[in-house]
């Protein structure tokens, strides 16, 4: 999760793609609570404002800004020690360009499609990078680990450090509409279907 990968980059900058989405807005809050400066990618000025309200330190609007160039500017040329990429195919190469030497790319989703045909040699060319593809099952692999994670999450919510905002609700009969809006990046925060 955010806390385990960010623990040794306390008060440093991380990059998080899709910072105004459900997972991204939660990551903005969590990073801020940990004292980590989250740089979030977004697709509009409205989403940039939303991500900042959720705790993002800075945002990059990829619809008209060069993400890798802005990361260099925001980090004073150092890049980010950790990049979180839940988008996948569309952001893979940009993510690699934003990771600091010997840094970590956390590839946890594939909203734009799966990353395929990875040439491992690119990791050395970009600065001896590390890549991980975590799953919840890999971290919550025992009842004890699951309980620790739940305690941390609900503890943060109880302390008011995290809040879960349901930004859009759709009846189950409109699932196709909700999916289209999510795929077209027309939503912010979390979207739920109501039976």
Language model features with spans:
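Single conserved hydrophobic/aromatic residue that forms the stacking wall/gate
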Residues: 1-6, 10
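Glycine-rich NAD(P) Rossmann-fold beta1-alpha1 loop
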Residues: 21-25
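Adenosine-nucleotide cofactor-binding segment
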Residues: 32-91, 142-144
């Amino acid at each position: 999760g955010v806390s385990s990968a960010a623990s040794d980059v306390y008060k440093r900058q991380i990059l998080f793609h899709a910072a105004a989405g459900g997972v991204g807005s939660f990551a903005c809050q969590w990073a801020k609570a940990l004292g980590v400066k989250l740089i979030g990618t977004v697709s509009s000025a409205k989403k940039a404002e939303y991500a900042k309200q959720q705790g993002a330190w800075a945002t990059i609007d990829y619809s008209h800004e060069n993400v890798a160039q802005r990361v260099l500017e925001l980090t004073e040329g150092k890049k980010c020690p950790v990049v979180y990429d839940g988008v996948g195919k569309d952001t893979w190469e940009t993510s690699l360009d934003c990771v600091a030497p010997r840094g970590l790319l956390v590839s946890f989703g594939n909203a734009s499609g799966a990353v395929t045909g990875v040439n491992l040699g690119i990791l050395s060319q970009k600065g001896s990078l590390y890549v991980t593809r975590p799953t919840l099952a890999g971290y919550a692999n025992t009842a004890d680990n699951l309980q620790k994670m739940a305690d941390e999450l609900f503890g943060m919510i109880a302390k008011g450090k995290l809040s879960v905002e349901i930004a859009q609700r759709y009846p189950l009969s409109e699932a196709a509409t909700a999916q289209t809006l999510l795929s077209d990046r027309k939503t912010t925060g979390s979207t739920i279907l109501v039976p």
